[in-house]
């Protein structure tokens, strides 16, 4: 599942992940959309942007984790620093990645988390 308020970023990220063999079960443009979609989509991993209008990625994660405590969430943001990483840990983000780390690193981490969730890691 990809959550990003910027249309072209959300589309590009989802399409690149799909081209590389990942099943993107949902795309959401806001935290509220993500919260509404997550139950029906049942994603293994959520790739979450931080800065979005309305509720941000941290609050969205907090609300999702209330209902789905084991949900894996990767915070994927251009605004990563130690303060944001600490806040992300507090709400249950599984992993923080800067967008500067690039798509290959994101894909490696999604693969790793998927294997861990399947019990194969």
Positions of PLM-derived features:
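Two-component/phosphorelay signaling modules centered on CheY-like receiver
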Residues: 7-26
């Amino acid at each position: 599942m990809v959550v990003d308020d910027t249309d072209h970023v959300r589309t590009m990220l989802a399409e690149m992940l799909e081209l590389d063999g990942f099943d993107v079960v949902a795309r959401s443009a806001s935290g509220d959309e993500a919260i509404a979609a997550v139950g029906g989509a049942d994603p293994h991993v959520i790739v979450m942007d931080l800065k979005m209008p309305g509720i941000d990625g941290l609050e969205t994660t907090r609300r999702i984790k209330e209902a789905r405590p084991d949900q894996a969430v990767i915070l994927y943001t251009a605004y990563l620093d130690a303060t944001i990483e600490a806040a992300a840990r507090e709400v249950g983000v599984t992993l923080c990645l800067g967008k500067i780390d690039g798509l290959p690193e994101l894909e490696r981490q999604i693969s790793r988390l998927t294997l861990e969730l399947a019990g194969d890691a």
